[in-house]
């Protein structure tokens, strides 16, 4: 269940930002700044995708867990039983 719940957002966001970065430049009108607009569009798609990917991967495998004192652990255990 976890692999499926992780794979679906990755596929959706990869497709979304891929379409913006690859298909978006096709719709930029011709003009003197066309190259700049295409560069900005592709750079924005890449940066937003990488920001999202790094954030989701950091949540998937955190470097450290919550730091609890022994008293807190015993109190939570007492309340949950």
Curated annotation (Swiss-Prot):
It is found in: Membrane; Cytoplasmic vesicle, Clathrin-coated vesicle membrane; Cytoplasmic vesicle, Secretory vesicle, Synaptic vesicle membrane. Residues 29-35 are cytoplasmic. Residues 1-7, 57-81 are lumenal. Expressed in brain (at protein level). GO terms for molecular function: proton-transporting ATPase activity, rotational mechanism. One of its GO terms (cellular component) is vacuolar proton-transporting V-type ATPase, V0 domain. Glycans are attached at residue 70. It is a multi-pass membrane protein. The chain crosses the membrane at residues 8-28, 36-56. GO terms for biological process: proton transmembrane transport; synaptic vesicle lumen acidification; transmembrane transport. The keyword Transmembrane applies. It holds the Pfam family ATP_synt_H. It comes from the Eukaryota. Keywords: Cytoplasmic vesicle, Glycoprotein, Hydrogen ion transport, Ion transport, Membrane, Synapse, Transmembrane, Transmembrane helix, Transport. Its main location: membrane. Disulfide bonds: none annotated. Belongs to the V-ATPase e1/e2 subunit family. Subunit of the V0 complex of vacuolar(H+)-ATPase (V-ATPase), a multisubunit enzyme composed of a peripheral complex (V1) that hydrolyzes ATP and a membrane integral complex (V0) that translocates protons. V-ATPase is responsible for acidifying and maintaining the pH of intracellular compartments and in some cell types, is targeted to the plasma membrane, where it is responsible for acidifying the extracellular environment. V-ATPase is a heteromultimeric enzyme made up of two complexes: the ATP-hydrolytic V1 complex and the proton translocation V0 complex. The V1 complex consists of three catalytic AB heterodimers that form a heterohexamer, three peripheral stalks each consisting of EG heterodimers, one central rotor including subunits D and F, and the regulatory subunits C and H. The proton translocation complex V0 consists of the proton transport subunit a, a ring of proteolipid subunits c9c'', rotary subunit d, subunits e and f, and the accessory subunits ATP6AP1/Ac45 and ATP6AP2/PRR. This is V-type proton ATPase subunit e 2. It comes from Rattus norvegicus (Rat). The gene is Atp6v0e2.
